[in-house]
Amino acid sequence: MRRPRLLLLLTAVLWGHVGLASAETDEPRRNVFDDPFQQLTRGQPNCPVPPGPMLTEADAKAQAHGRIERGTSCYRAGRCRLPNSYLYDKEIMPRVQKAVDADGRFGSTTSVWALGQRRWIWLQGCVGSEAESTALESLVRGIDDVEGVVNELKVVP
């Protein structure tokens, strides 16, 4: 049980370091790996847009090998029906949007973006309370094919 939590922590730390290293350069950024990234709610107009999957070429090269290994490991282990876990992301993201819209609790008080990578969903943006943050994470975690959720939401009352 401790391994998934350790993996989650290490992944979050890695992404934080990659983002910080990239923030210091003026290199052009793009969504090199075509990871789905979309705004789910728009209730806090002053919430800044998160960087999402925008990478420099150097960042993309640094991540490429690890993405290949992580992408195919779930299929080799028999946990995925598709040969690469990144193939799920474009199927999952519409379900995330649909679940948030159908729930109805978050539209007027949050501005949230979702980033999908290898069956994991990163929630980024602003919520009105810790309870909203927890409820949104729980909602997304319950969606089919979602393996994990990284909650990077900031509480902005």
Tell where the protein language model's regions lie, with residue ranges.
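N-terminal targeting leaders
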Residues: 2-157
